């Protein structure tokens, strides 16, 4: 029991030692290189915490985010990944709406604390739409047997599936589109197994066979009329070609195309 108490005491003392201010021995004139690069960007006031990583190697690091009286300090180890708590982030954004955050990154490198030149993150007054829909697929050119269409809450990064292709024979699905950003009215295509276009209007779901003798292909790229009564589609005969030397390896081109409504 005595040993356990001693260990706990040392842990508490260690945490107290880490939580105090650090003595900066060198101030740099360069801004930190971080990933993703949020230096001097503009963000909406309702975006989820923008976690980031310091690219430079270090033993430990700190990030100080400030706006007026609101201040948030995040500490990290040698991985230099800053994970921003949601509650503190929301307070900062409320204070910085229409203004900006000041961000200072400090790092312990070569047995001394250095401070990078501060940078700002501008905060707009206008909020962003809360949800984003996208297709998620492994990077590459040929493999597509695992994919899905997902939606993500941009205010907290919660993600859930609209549909995954494990429900439809691991086929390809693509070109999802909403009418005027209305989640109640959307469409997307299924390829290979269960080939069709699915049209969703509220609780009504229609499966459409869109290949005819008069068109080049099934429907491809959509564009909604604002009324939601019409959709213009391209029909295409597409091919892929691969470059041997260029870093942009794949080239997609049309051999023929048309537009239908």
Positions of PLM-derived features:
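C-terminal motif of bacterial Sec signal peptides marking the signal peptidase cleavage site
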Residues: 16-17
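Low-complexity, Pro/Ser/Thr- and charge-rich linker/hinge segments at domain boundaries
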Residues: 34, 113-141, 214-215
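Conserved beta-strand position repeated once per blade in WD40 beta-propeller domains
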Residues: 51, 175-177, 221-223
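Short, conserved, GDST-rich strand-edge loop motifs in beta-rich repeat architectures
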Residues: 130-143, 199, 233-256
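Hydrophobic beta-strand positions that form the internal "hydrophobic ladder"
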Residues: 132, 185-186, 228-231
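Beta-propeller blade signature
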Residues: 149-153, 200-203, 250-261
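Surface loop/turn motifs at the tips and blade-to-blade linkers of beta-strand repeat domains
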Residues: 163-170, 210-216
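Residue-level detector of Asp-centered blade-edge/turn motifs that repeat once per structural unit
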Residues: 180-182, 226-227
């Amino acid at each position: 029991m005595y040993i356990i108490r001693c260990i706990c005491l040392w842990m508490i003392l260690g945490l107290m030692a880490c939580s105090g201010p650090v003595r900066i021995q060198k101030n740099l004139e360069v801004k930190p290189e971080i990933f993703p690069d949020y230096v001097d960007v503009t963000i909406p006031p309702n975006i989820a915490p923008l976690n980031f990583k310091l690219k430079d190697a270090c033993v430990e690091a700190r990030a100080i985010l400030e706006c007026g009286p609101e201040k948030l300090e995040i500490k990290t180890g040698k991985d230099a990944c800053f994970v921003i708590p949601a509650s503190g982030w929301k307070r900062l954004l409320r204070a910085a709406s229409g203004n900006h955050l000041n961000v200072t990154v400090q790092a312990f490198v070569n047995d001394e604390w250095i401070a990078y030149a501060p940078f700002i993150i501008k905060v707009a007054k206008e909020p962003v739409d809360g949800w984003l829909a996208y297709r998620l697929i492994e990077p590459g050119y040929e493999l597509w047997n695992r994919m899905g269409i997902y939606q993500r809450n941009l205010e907290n990064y919660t993600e859930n599936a609209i549909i995954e292709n494990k429900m439809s024979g691991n086929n390809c699905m693509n070109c999802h589109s909403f009418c005027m950003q209305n989640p109640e009215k959307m469409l997307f295509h299924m390829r290979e197994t269960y080939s069709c276009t699915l049209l969703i209007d509220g609780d009504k779901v229609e499966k459409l066979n869109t290949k005819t003798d008069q068109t080049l292909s099934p429907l491809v790229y959509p564009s909604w009329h604002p009324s939601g009564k019409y959709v213009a589609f391209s029909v295409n005969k597409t091919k892929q070609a691969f470059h041997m030397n260029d870093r942009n390896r794949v080239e997609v081109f049309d051999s023929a195309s048309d537009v239908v409504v």
